[in-house]
Amino acid sequence: MPRRKAAGPPWDAAGPVAAGGGRRRPGAQGGGRRRPRPSGGSSGGSSEEEAPRERRPRDGSPGARRPGRPGGAAAAAPGGPGARGQSVVICEPEHSKERIKLEGSKSRGQLLIFGATNWDLIGRKEVPKQQAAFRNLGQNLWGPHRYGSLGALRVRSVVSGPCAAHSLLITAEGRLWSWGRNEKGQLGHGDTKRVEAPRPIEALSGESIVAAACGRNHTLALTESGAVFAFGENKLGQLGLGNQTDAVPSPTQILYNGQPICKLGCGAEFSMVMDCKGNLYSFGCPEYGQLGHNSDGKFIARAQRIEYDCELLPRRLALFVERTKDGQVLPVPNVVVRDVACGANHTLVLDSQKRVFSWGFGGYGRLGHAEQKDEMVPRLVKLFDFPGRGAAQIYAGYTCSFAVSETGGLFFWGATNTSRESTMYPKAVQDLCGWKIRSLACGKSSVIVAADESTISWGPSPTFGELGYGDHKPKSSTAAQEVKTLDGIYTEQVAMGYSHSLVIARDESEAEQEKLRKLPEYNPRTL
């Protein structure tokens, strides 16, 4: 029998263990540090930050060592050449590791885009000096457009995120394409040059991609065999490579040797991956407790300076809790995770019993616990913990959360408009009562939904076209409205970035193709 890998105590059962069997000291989980900033604001990965203080790796070599093949055989073998100085993530013998073949989305269609396309200006008051040449590229698309360069390319999935100014698409053949902002290499093309229109990621041409996720400046991609590739910003360890390289512009496999991964998600500066057994792992910045390890990673480095201890490798979440009416905190046993969704600084999970847990930054009530307190470990959202009241789908926005119940009702909590009153616990969205929701996505403050034969959106001012209402129509709406510019077009899936929307429009019949041909083409200017 193969030698068993070192196993830690229950709290850290699959957490990193120092090579040679030594438990790492408390307060040094990830070894990463970050520059302080006001604790009340949202994490900002694009601001200028001081390089982390060099720390000596456990193998004694100077500097942060980067292994030759992250996540490869050397890292997997307990006594192999890559075992020294690396963390053991799973505690099971090699022969118990399952082999799986994941399937991507069954939907097929053409990509449509609307919203802001000046990628370097999104979420900023002005374009950074180093991107000044691109200042006048891109525009606000107030209605749906087709990318002229894509022709009739068939797409099965589109991906962005509420913090992201970049986007991804997965073709019907499983190829991953990317475009948008690229200051940290988050497009995976091996450079940091902005890309105006979708372009295939050549480094992943040999892989069949089934899912992907976008953070503020980083990206994760999942292959059909359950392997995860990461690229983009890694200053806070959000790529799971065991180091804090500022940027990794080419796809690199994460340092993980557990069961195959089948779901993933990205927050602003952290990442979540879920294995096929229902275990959840997190890595990146621990601010607000968003990693779920019962700590916000905060420590005082010196006078007037707070830093954060980042998780540089995937670490399993070992504790799920519920709070009783009298304030007792009790562990919830046997949680098997089935889905995960990440907002900017919070996370939702759906388990096998249709329960919802949330944790991270509690501002605006986005966790659904009727209070604004940050949660350091996954906490049960009470509303969905009743027979017949469970959740079937979960979605996380920048400062809000959504869930579709098993009976089809849409529930919302948090805030899309942070200048108005927040919803502190899940409430039914009456405007969408009776609609069968197929797909939902959130931007910074806007929401788009694919339901029945319609596409629906809403969001407060300012908007940049991501609601898709058209050139000569109101640009914002605080109530849900049908997107009339997509009348007669069946939307398979929706995705939303910080202030742009992506839609997969079905093109199976001649009539559907004819409707799509009538939409305007978008051919962005390039330098």
Region locations from a protein language model:
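Eukaryote-biased RCC1-like beta-propeller repeat architecture
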Residues: P2-L527
